[in-house]
Amino acid sequence: MRALMAFIVVLSTCGSALAFDAFQATGIDRRAGATLPLDLAFQDESGRPTTLRQAGHGKPIVLAPVVHRCPNICGLTLAGLAQTAAGQKFVAGRDFTIVAFGIDPREGPADARQSLDKLRQSFPSLRHGILGFTGTERDIKSITDRLGYRYGWDDDLQQYAHIAAVAVLTPDGRLSRWLYGIAPDPVDLRLALTEAGNGKIGTWGDQLLLLCYHYDPQTGRYGSLIWTALRIGGAITVVAAGGLIGLAILRERRRLQRDAP
């Protein structure tokens, strides 16, 4: 995961001077459970004032920090997220909302609209399931600081360096999980939404499935507890079998030594 994130940071800062350290400026600090101010005022891509609370409609939010005019990875990140959303059972706009959260305070609704229009053409199912936010530097930082999401401005390239990741928020604005990379795994997104939904979305089957997985904050992925248990059990079995075989060989050698003339 660190290698992937490093690759993404390099894409965002390719050609920058040594004075700017993208690896020092960017990152995600672990702040699971942090509460976001849901009522800060932003603008959506149509120029209407809105808030994260209004965007969520009481459902989980998948928040993707982006630069709407980003020439590098942001378009790929949103396209990857859209593809991931289409590959799992929950429906954007019905079960959850995607917020393309602009981190550049110089951008406005027109920038968000331009980037989302292209996305909606490729993914018509997201037409009502994704919003593009822009806002003031103070309000943007209020959200990113609570999330522990760090990014930096490169004076030479005149653009932001940042990491490709999405934050999954609970309906009441708590940070539930981070999913890393340009295109999260659909199973990971489904599990993260189930967990963040607190029973408000999904079925009992989804809740039971969640019991079979655990979240690894190092990788931003969910792993199967059953598969992990099987691997541990298999390793224990191999060690135990090896010990029994070794003990049997030792006993046989001792018997042969006693029986020798």
Predicted regions and their residues:
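Juxtamembrane interface at the cytosolic side of transmembrane helices
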Residues: 240-261
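N-terminal signal peptide c-region/cleavage motif recognized by signal peptidases
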Residues: 14-16
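Short active-site neighborhood of thiol/selenol oxidoreductases, capturing the structured segment around
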Residues: 51-81, 98-99
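N-terminal "domain-start" segment that seeds a small globular fold
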Residues: 20-54, 76-83
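Positively charged n-region of N-terminal signal peptides that target proteins for export
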Residues: 1-4
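Extracytoplasmic/lumenal ectodomains and periplasmic regions of secretory and membrane proteins
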Residues: 153-212
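Juxtamembrane/start-of-transmembrane alpha-helix segments at the extracytoplasmic/lumenal side
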Residues: 216-239
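Structural microenvironment flanking redox-active thiols in thiol-disulfide oxidoreductases
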Residues: 78-140
